[in-house]
């Protein structure tokens, strides 16, 4: 068996964008690969047919999504043509759509729109619903000529040196500055080449679900001018009259999803009253006027996939209504599965394997998922009666003949709460030797570690480290009470992590307890900062995309003004002392641990100022420390950053631990 190398992950393939055909016999999806030399990702469409064959549909490396127009035709956006690519690079609002005929493989340009379209839905009769970005500075780009649009783009270049902000949030991680920019709903008539806006310039459309036979659509929206609230609304659109009506059954509510289930509307959301913004949602039913509602199911777990991995790229579906059921992905324990629920309120689990369901689609009896299973990378599966049939082998050779470390579970208790963690032994483990170890802490905090493939941890195991990780209180998968650490950051979660570390060291005597390091990102970075200010037991630390100071986080993060208040039950004005008590920066004068900080310049979730503050504090107090900043990257560097940057990140972390733990 060969040792796993750092660069191996650049050869992995990542799957996303499942879309089943109208008859359910085939499914189209996107395969992403890394082009390390040119520091980019390549994305192309593939088709899985009922006869078991997999066919590549595009090869221009520009296609990430598609919809079915009929059984023989797909519609997809692309910048494959030079004129389109040039205008996109010149910052023109533009999306060009192409039609692909599956029988002949002919591709033709269908239409182009002076909008940056994020989603398209075909209504029939050459009419489409669009979700597209609207920038108030650009104005109504769909109403002016190409010449006038070019002039507008040139005029705005004069504004490149300035950002005028008059609302919060004013930026968003992965998007940049978002002031007075919204996702609006449009109707496009391709026969008339006519675009009609259906929502105003202050409203964000977060999701849309169609019911073509009823001639209606459901929209989840949020409107704001100065400050975005934590509630949103449910609207219904009449596709004939284009009348948009608010039908929110519950006010001051956070709607996650709404769709048509038979002659009822099923919606998923949370009141936030008992457990704040991270409260697990419930499932409800209402009629199409939204005058009353009933709770269909009192879910005890969340409705998203929160299983961590660094081997995904692209987006996945979380909800879909098909025939008599609402299908959704949910995390229970340390893995996610696909579930469904009908009007009778009975909850059924559709998948049975442990791991991670990263995307799915359903059409009648056909169920398709993209999943991580055991220590295998993503593949496409069909599901029937909970049995999974692997349909693709894109990654079958990626880990072939590679040495992998199987995570060994460790269940223990703290404060009468059951907790789970895992330990990975070094490759080529010899019980006569002693090894260094790394504690890895996940982000969130409401996410989970599981037993799926995680490249960085497998790589460290192959470099001769024990690697151990757990789901402390605050994590997902075990209900609201377990996940609720509001006002308790750095207390019970810290205790869980330290007791876990004790138990790992006691259970694995081959770990050299004087050569143990700690790392983590986001919340895991916060906990790394907290840990080094409260104990000197770790010989080295790497803090990634972290939080150091809740007060600065409150005023700079794209989620700061509501997340900091919710998670600390305090603001800088009503209880600044509490924010400071839970800020790692307060304890920086107690740090002795050599610490590396990893931070992206465009991380607007945990802004660069967080890493800089902690780094400066350690330098001020004479602690060995180093800060590596990544230009052009955001909070998702470790998951979707440019290939060369992801390699450099892992190299910096590994070399730091090699230096201080060997």
Regions found by a protein language model. Give the residues of each.
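Glycine-rich His-Gly loop
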Residues: 32, 133, 440-444, 600
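Active-site-proximal cap/loop segments of hydrolase catalytic domains
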Residues: 472-662
């Amino acid at each position: 068996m060969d040792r796993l190398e750092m660069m191996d992950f650049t050869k992995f393939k990542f799957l996303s964008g499942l879309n089943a055909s109208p008859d359910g016999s085939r499914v189209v999806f996107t395969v992403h690969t890394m082009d390390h030399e040119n520091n980019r990702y390549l994305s192309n469409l593939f088709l899985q047919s009922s006869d078991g064959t997999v066919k590549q549909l595009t090869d221009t490396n520009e296609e990430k999504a598609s919809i079915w127009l009929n059984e023989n035709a797909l519609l997809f956006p692309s910048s494959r043509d030079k004129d389109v690519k040039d205008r996109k690079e010149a910052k023109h609002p533009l999306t060009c759509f192409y039609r692909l005929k599956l029988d002949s493989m002919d591709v033709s340009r269908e239409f182009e729109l002076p909008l940056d379209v994020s989603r398209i839905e075909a209504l029939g009769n050459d009419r489409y619903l669009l979700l597209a970005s609207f920038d108030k500075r650009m104005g109504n780009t769909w109403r002016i000529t190409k010449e006038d649009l070019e002039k507008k783009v040139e005029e705005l270049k004069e504004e490149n040196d300035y950002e005028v902000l008059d609302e919060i949030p004013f930026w968003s991680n992965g998007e940049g500055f978002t002031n007075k920019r919204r996702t609006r709903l449009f109707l496009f008539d391709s026969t008339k080449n006519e675009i009609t806006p259906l929502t105003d310039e202050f409203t964000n459309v977060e999701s849309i679900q169609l019911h073509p036979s009823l001639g209606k659509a459901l929209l989840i929206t949020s409107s704001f001018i100065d400050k975005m609230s934590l509630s949103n609304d449910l609207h219904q659109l009449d596709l004939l009259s284009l009348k948009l009506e608010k039908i929110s059954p519950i006010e001051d509510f956070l709607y996650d999803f709404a769709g048509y289930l038979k002659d009822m509307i099923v919606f998923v959301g949370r009141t936030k009253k008992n457990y704040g913004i991270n409260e697990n949602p419930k499932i409800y039913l209402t009629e199409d006027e939204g005058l009353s509602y009933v709770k269909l199911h009192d879910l005890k777990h969340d409705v998203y996939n929160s299983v961590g991995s660094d081997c995904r790229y692209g987006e996945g579906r979380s909800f879909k209504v098909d025939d008599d059921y609402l299908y959704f992905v949910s995390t229970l324990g340390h893995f996610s599965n696909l579930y469904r629920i009908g009007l009778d309120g009975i909850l059924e689990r559709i998948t049975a394997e442990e791991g991670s369901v990263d995307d799915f689609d359903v059409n009648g009896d056909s169920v398709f998922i993209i999943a991580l299973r055991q220590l295998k990378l993503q593949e496409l599966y069909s599901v029937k009666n909970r049995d999974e049939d692997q349909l693709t082998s894109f990654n079958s050779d990626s880990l072939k003949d590679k040495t992998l470390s199987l995570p060994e579970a460790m269940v223990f208790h703290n404060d009468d709460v059951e907790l789970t963690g895992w330990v990975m032994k070094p490759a080529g483990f010899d019980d006569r030797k002693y090894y260094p170890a790394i504690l890895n802490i996940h982000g969130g905090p409401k996410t989970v570690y599981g037993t799926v493939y995680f490249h960085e941890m497998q790589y460290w195991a192959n470099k001769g480290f024990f690697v151990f990780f757990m789901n402390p209180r605050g994590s997902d998968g075990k209900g609201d009470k377990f996940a609720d650490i509001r006002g308790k950051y750095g207390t019970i979660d810290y205790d869980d992590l330290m007791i876990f570390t004790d138990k790992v060291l006691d259970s694995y005597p081959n770990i050299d307890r004087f050569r143990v390091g700690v790392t983590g990102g986001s919340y895991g970075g916060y906990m790394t900062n907290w840990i080094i200010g409260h104990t000197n037991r770790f010989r080295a630390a790497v803090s990634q995309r972290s939080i150091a100071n809740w007060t600065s986080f409150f005023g700079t993060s794209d989620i700061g003004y509501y997340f900091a208040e919710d998670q600390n039950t305090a603001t800088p004005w009503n209880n600044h002392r509490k924010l400071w008590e839970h800020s790692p920066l307060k304890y920086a004068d107690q740090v002795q641990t050599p610490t590396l900080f990893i931070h992206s310049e465009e991380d607007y979730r945990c802004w660069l100022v967080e890493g800089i503050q902690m780094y400066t504090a350690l330098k001020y107090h004479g602690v060995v420390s180093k800060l590596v900043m990544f230009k052009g990257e955001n909070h998702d560097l470790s998951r979707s950053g440019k290939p060369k940057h992801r390699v450099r990140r892992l190299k910096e972390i590994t070399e730091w631990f090699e230096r201080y733990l060997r």
